[in-house]
A protein has these predicted regions:
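Membrane-interfacial helix-loop-helix
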Residues: 2-6, 13, 24-62, 101-158, ...
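Non-cytoplasmic
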Residues: 181, 185-198, 203
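Transmembrane alpha-helix boundary and packing residues in multipass membrane permease domains
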Residues: 80-81, 108, 117, 160-161, ...
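Hydrophobic residues within alpha-helical transmembrane segments
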Residues: 63, 67, 94, 98-102, ...
Length: 241
């Protein structure tokens, strides 16, 4: 009987374990393939293929980007730069956002299938601080989801897992991801759109540009707007409003 109960549990964990295994293998095998140097070396072949087969290139790019994010492979930043390099700020940013959102959704579904429902039930049944945290997230889901997407310091993989573990509805996850990653995607896509000049000078792009004041401050402003409802709810709760 115990053996029978273990099998469904292992089957439920199979998707997230498979992603973890592919991520580990990818980190070893693709470390040099999905890199800025590889993009620089193959840029002429990529642009020539794009010019000859634009639709195929766009579809293949989005499929590859979705796989990179969905399997947590190294190279998501390089993929974003590549989107800008090949397709410009627009539709490059659109391709990047859509592919990243689809990849994030794959991780979300795998994690929720394996762990989310069970962990969420345990948190609902618990008491004390754990229950308060779960209740706080449930009451402010939209704000929290946008916040973890907007804050540059939150790793993308973490922002995909946490909502799954607290049983956030799929549509909320998808919408908040698609909208929340837009600022960062536009910034890095614009960097990618300027790679032609960077390649010509033999330089490397400034990937720390998102932390420069003229870009970081507006993003922090969006973070403040995202967390404002949480603060207002907390104040109202204390005052009994």
């Amino acid at each position: 009987m115990a053996e029978t109960s273990k099998k469904p549990r292992l089957m439920r964990l199979a998707p997230i374990l498979g992603i973890g295994l592919v991520a580990l293998i990818g980190a070893i095998l693709l470390r040099d393939t999905l890199s800025f140097d590889a993009l620089a070396e193959n840029r002429e072949a990529l642009t020539a293929f794009r010019d000859a087969h634009y639709v195929v290139t766009a579809a293949a790019f989005m499929l590859a980007y979705t796989a990179i994010v969905g399997f947590s492979l190294p190279g998501a930043t390089i993929a974003t730069l590549t989107g800008g390099f090949l397709f410009g700020i627009f539709p490059g940013a659109l391709f990047n956002v859509l592919a990243a959102t689809l990849g994030a959704t794959l991780i979300f579904l795998a994690a929720r299938y394996g762990l989310g429902d069970r962990l969420s039930r345990r948190m609902d049944a618990s008491e004390g601080m754990v229950r308060k945290i779960k209740t706080g997230i449930d009451e402010n889901q939209w704000s929290m989801l946008f916040l973890i997407r907007l804050v540059p310091a939150v790793p993308f993989f973490v922002a995909n897992l946490v909502p799954a573990l607290v049983n956030v509805p799929l549509y909320r996850f998808f919408v908040s991801t698609a909208l929340g990653i837009v600022p960062g995607a536009v910034v890095y896509t614009s960097v990618g759109a300027g790679l032609g000049e960077v390649f010509a000078k033999g330089e490397t792009p400034n990937l720390g540009i998102i932390f420069e004041p003229h870009i970081l401050l507006p993003i922090l402003g969006l973070c403040a707007l995202a967390i404002l409802p949480v603060i207002l709810n907390a104040v109202r709760g204390k005052k009994g409003i």
